[in-house]
């Protein structure tokens, strides 16, 4: 008897047909979201489009490897698709006018599938880009094995194929349906709520929404929980890699002399510039993890709430918590696709400089070889002027210091093959990479040969 009384008490709080119109948010929320979504849309499209152009310029000018460029361009494309596919359709069908008729079932399925694919492509691109940087910093001798053009294409292909597989179940589980249709296979509350024509004839209901179909409940649940597991694995993996990269970057590199013969490697005391670059990189790595956690978690919680139990078992408190969370989770989710260009600008002075040049249509960046030659000529002229009145030991010291100053101001150096003799080859650099404050220099190298030094 007590069990029956408790069940009746819970059933008195379960939503019914009178609550269905509340799936449409209040007008003031709609207007606020219009303004917020418009700002996010413009900033996101512009920022990611400029990012694509900047990475192409940096690669062409010799500052960025093609493999890193491919990763960043693919990530920016997935972010742009998230905005183009997700934001207009989601705002209209979920926020502005959620109640519709079943005639829009195909558009609901396609939108959900494509949006899920692009969303998880963005997530997995963060994973692969972090993995590429992790190998370069923590396991540099293994870097070439995973950084070739073929390996990068395989990684990018893996990202898009895996994202499509994660989203594929939603193509069958989603559709247009009256939200309170009973799920036949679900053993939930037996409340015997009053039925309406929308229950009996869901195919003719004008109060349907784009939601999970009642006869595909298990498919929907497995899809949402599986996607959540993928998110947790990616978050944990990126956090692990960023933590290990930060440990490597925080190690002291003072006073180490290694090597034999003509090749000597001198690890110098860090300059203020190197310390600043390292601090910015550590901040950048932390921001990657924070962005994945803060921007993605609210949306994942909302999805788990939708998959935890069918809507006909939702209490009024549960339903209102879901509707309050909806606009916040969507906003934070779209912000995750806006912050990537911002992180690049924070992490690299070179990227930030070219970003604003592209934005202002005033590109003045010189090729890396040309810039190094100009610096070499300036140093040669300066050294020849002062050599008559300076001991050779001080002259050699100044040349060593000038070589240190020629290090490009970017963060995680990308290892390249050494230039051939007599050929100046630039050191392409990743815009999210810190300099390590060490150099490899042949004994007795001339100023011209300094263009071929390999800076690690």
Curated annotation (Swiss-Prot):
Q: Which residues lie on this side of the membrane: Cytoplasmic?
A: 56-69, 132-151, 243-283, 345-456
Which residues fall in a coiled-coil region? none
Expression tissues: Expression is detected in septumamygdala, parietal cells, enterocytes, neurons and pancreas, in peripheral organs such as the duodenum and kidney but not in the pituitary and hypothalamus.
| Molecular function terms, GO-annotated | G protein-coupled receptor activity; metal ion binding
Indicate how the chain sits in the lipid bilayer: Multi-pass membrane protein
User: In the UniProt record, which residues carry a glycan?
Assistant: 192, 206
Q: Which residues carry this modification: Phosphoserine?
A: 397
Q: Where is this region: Disordered?
A: 415-456
- Intrachain disulfide bonds: 11-191, 108-210
Ranges of the Extracellular topological domain: 1-34, 90-109, 173-217, 306-323
**GO CC terms of this entry:** plasma membrane
* Further information: Was originally reported to be the receptor of obestatin. However, numerous reports concluded that GPR39 was not the receptor for obestatin.
**Function of the molecule:** Zinc-sensing receptor that can sense changes in extracellular Zn(2+), mediate Zn(2+) signal transmission, and participates in the regulation of numerous physiological processes including glucose homeostasis regulation, gastrointestinal mobility, hormone secretion and cell death. Activation by Zn(2+) in keratinocytes increases the intracellular concentration of Ca(2+) and activates the ERK/MAPK and PI3K/AKT signaling pathways leading to epithelial repair.
In the record, the note on similarity to other proteins reads: Belongs to the G-protein coupled receptor 1 family.
Task: Tell me the protein's name.
Answer: G-protein coupled receptor 39
Identify the coding gene: Gpr39
């Amino acid at each position: 008897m007590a069990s029956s009384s408790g069940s009746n008490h819970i059933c008195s709080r379960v939503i019914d047909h009178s609550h269905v119109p509340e799936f449409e948010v209040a007008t003031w929320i709609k207007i606020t979201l219009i303004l917020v979504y418009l700002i996010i849309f413009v900033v996101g499209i512009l920022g990611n489009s400029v990012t694509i152009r900047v990475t192409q310029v940096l690669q062409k000018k010799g500052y960025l490897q093609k493999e890193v460029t491919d990763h960043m361009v693919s990530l920016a494309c997935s972010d742009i698709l998230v905005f183009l596919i997700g934001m207009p359709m989601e705002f209209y069908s979920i926020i502005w006018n959620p109640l519709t008729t079943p005639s829009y079932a195909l558009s609901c399925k396609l939108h959900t599938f494509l949006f899920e694919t692009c969303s998880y492509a963005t997530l997995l691109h963060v994973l692969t880009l972090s993995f590429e940087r992790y190998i370069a910093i923590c396991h540099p001798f293994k870097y070439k094995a995973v950084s070739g053009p073929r390996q990068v294409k395989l990684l990018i292909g893996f990202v898009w194929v895996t994202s499509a597989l994660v989203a594929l179940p939603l193509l069958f589980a989603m559709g247009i349906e009256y939200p309170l249709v009973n799920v036949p296979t679900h053993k939930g509350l037996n409340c015997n709520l009053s039925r309406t024509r929308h229950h009996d004839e869901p195919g003719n209901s004008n109060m349907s929404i784009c939601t999970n179909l009642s006869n595909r409940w298990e498919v929907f649940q497995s899809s949402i929980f599986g996607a959540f597991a993928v998110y947790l694995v990616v978050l944990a993996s990126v956090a692990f890699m960023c933590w290990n990269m930060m440990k490597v970057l925080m190690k002291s590199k003072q006073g180490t002399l290694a090597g034999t013969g003509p090749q000597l490697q001198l690890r110098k005391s860090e300059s203020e510039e190197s310390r600043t670059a390292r601090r910015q990189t550590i901040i950048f790595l932390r921001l990657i993890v924070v962005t994945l956690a803060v921007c993605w978690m609210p949306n994942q919680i909302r999805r788990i709430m939708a998959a935890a139990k069918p809507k006909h078992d939702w209490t009024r408190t549960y339903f209102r918590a879901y509707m309050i969370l909806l606009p916040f989770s969507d906003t934070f989710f779209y912000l995750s696709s806006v912050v990537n260009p911002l992180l690049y600008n924070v992490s690299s002075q070179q990227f930030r400089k070219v970003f604003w040049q592209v934005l202002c249509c005033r590109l003045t960046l010189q090729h890396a070889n040309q810039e190094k030659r100009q610096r070499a000529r300036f140093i040669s002229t300066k050294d020849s002027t002062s050599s008559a009145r300076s001991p050779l030991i001080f002259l050699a010291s100044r040349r060593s210091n000038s070589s240190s100053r020629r290090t490009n101001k970017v963060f995680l150096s990308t290892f390249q093959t050494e230039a051939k003799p007599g050929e100046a080859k630039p050191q392409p650099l990743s815009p999210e990479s810190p300099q390590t404050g060490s150099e490899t220099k042949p004994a007795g190298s001339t100023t011209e040969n300094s263009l071929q030094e390999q800076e690690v």
